[in-house]
């Protein structure tokens, strides 16, 4: 008997053409849809969830998953696009892709993608949070493998597996939305984690990495406490030191395991020049 693949969403899945954008940029979204129509809802996630845009009635079409997609990527065509608003603040943005007619509570009917918005100009009073997007992909088993199940190289050109970006509170414990990462038997929350994952059929590695586990909690706390936070990705740091220009403080929160040499060089230079990391 073939076991279901709980890393995937049956109705609609997708990912963006890039991980970060600025005001006025066009965000492209590449989807595989088994539903004839779906809607996209774009929400900034911080202390509050604020919906900023919707794209309704997107015509769905399926796109093939290549062999070794975890390594080679999907290579999907763009399905729809939208423009980042001039008034959208820096932050993490979730894209919900929900098939028409699917109930809100049914995970099979909606996939999720993400992107970040970079600020127009750096504000030295606002810390810059670098999302650990390299680590997201290292643990992302979508397409068959991750770095912990046999892959030696992984692609960013694919969706994130179900549960990385958004997970509901468990109905048996409304105050619990998933343990951070410790899955040892000695951890007092381990049993709750196992029950939570079993109840929602979440893949194992969603407890080890991902926005939902780590940065989401920090941003929610920081913004609620009155701290302004700008957001960027590992890619932004890898591409050059410009993302650090004008900053006093750069933050890494949670499970930030995978770095490139360029990332480290840029941070070292930032610290040598008086920045705080």
Give the role of each language-model region.
Residues 60, 64-74, 79-83, 87-89, ...:
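Helical hinge/lid and interdomain linker segments adjacent to catalytic or ligand-binding clefts
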Residues 1, 72, 127-128:
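Extracytoplasmic entry segments of secretory-pathway proteins
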Residues 98, 132, 255:
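Flexible loop residues that form catalytic
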Residues 1-11:
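Proline/serine/threonine-rich low-complexity linkers at boundaries of modular beta-sandwich domains
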Residues 33-49, 53-58, 107-243:
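Aromatic-Pro/Gly-enriched surface loop or interdomain linker
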Residues 13-48, 53-102, 107-117:
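Ligand-binding face of N-terminal immunoglobulin V-set domains in extracellular IgSF glycoproteins
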